[in-house]
């Protein structure tokens, strides 16, 4: 995003707003991951420790989620690049 038309104070404010929004998005993503993997993997509530199966499930769940997020991010970047090329022509 181009903030060059704003003065220094406005640029700083916009940067803080964007940073706050990014942190909120990250926390929402993290909370969703925790909830999804907990609901899918936590089965035995008789112990504080995770079972071997639960540990494996959590690892697989987080790996799958992160790979999916990476793929979505890559597709978004590709789409953004196409949009920028289309706007430049």
Swiss-Prot record:
Q: What does this protein do?
A: Mitochondrial intermembrane chaperone that participates in the import and insertion of multi-pass transmembrane proteins into the mitochondrial inner membrane. Also required for the transfer of beta-barrel precursors from the TOM complex to the sorting and assembly machinery (SAM complex) of the outer membrane. Acts as a chaperone-like protein that protects the hydrophobic precursors from aggregation and guide them through the mitochondrial intermembrane space.
**Pfam family of the protein (one):** zf-Tim10_DDP
GO cellular component term of the entry, any:
mitochondrial intermembrane space protein transporter complex
Q: How does it sit in the membrane?
A: Peripheral membrane protein
Originating species = Cryptococcus neoformans var. neoformans serotype D (strain JEC21 / ATCC MYA-565) (Filobasidiella neoformans)
UniProt-listed SUPFAM superfamilies: Tim10-like
Motif span (Twin CX3C motif)? 37-61
Per UniProt, subunit arrangement is: Heterohexamer; composed of 3 copies of TIM9 and 3 copies of TIM10, named soluble 70 kDa complex. Associates with the TIM22 complex, whose core is composed of TIM22 and TIM54. Interacts with the transmembrane regions of multi-pass transmembrane proteins in transit.
- Give the lineage: Eukaryota, Fungi, Dikarya, Basidiomycota, Agaricomycotina
UniProt GO MF annotations: metal ion binding; protein transporter activity; unfolded protein binding
Where this protein primarily resides, as one coarse class?
mitochondrion
Give yes or no: UniProt keyword Metal-binding. yes
SS bond list: 37-61, 41-57
Entry keyword set: Chaperone, Disulfide bond, Membrane, Metal-binding, Mitochondrion, Mitochondrion inner membrane, Protein transport, Translocation, Transport, Zinc
This protein is called Mitochondrial import inner membrane translocase subunit TIM9
Gene Ontology biological process terms in this record? protein insertion into mitochondrial inner membrane
């Amino acid at each position: 995003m181009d903030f060059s038309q704003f003065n220094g104070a406005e640029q700083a404010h916009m940067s803080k707003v964007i940073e706050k929004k990014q942190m909120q998005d990250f926390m929402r993503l993290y909370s969703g991951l925790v909830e999804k993997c907990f609901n899918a993997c936590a089965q035995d509530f008789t112990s504080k420790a995770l079972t071997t199966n639960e540990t494996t499930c959590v690892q697989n769940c987080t790996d799958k989620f992160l790979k999916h997020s990476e793929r979505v991010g890559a597709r978004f970047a590709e789409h953004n690049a196409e949009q920028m090329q289309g706007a430049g022509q």
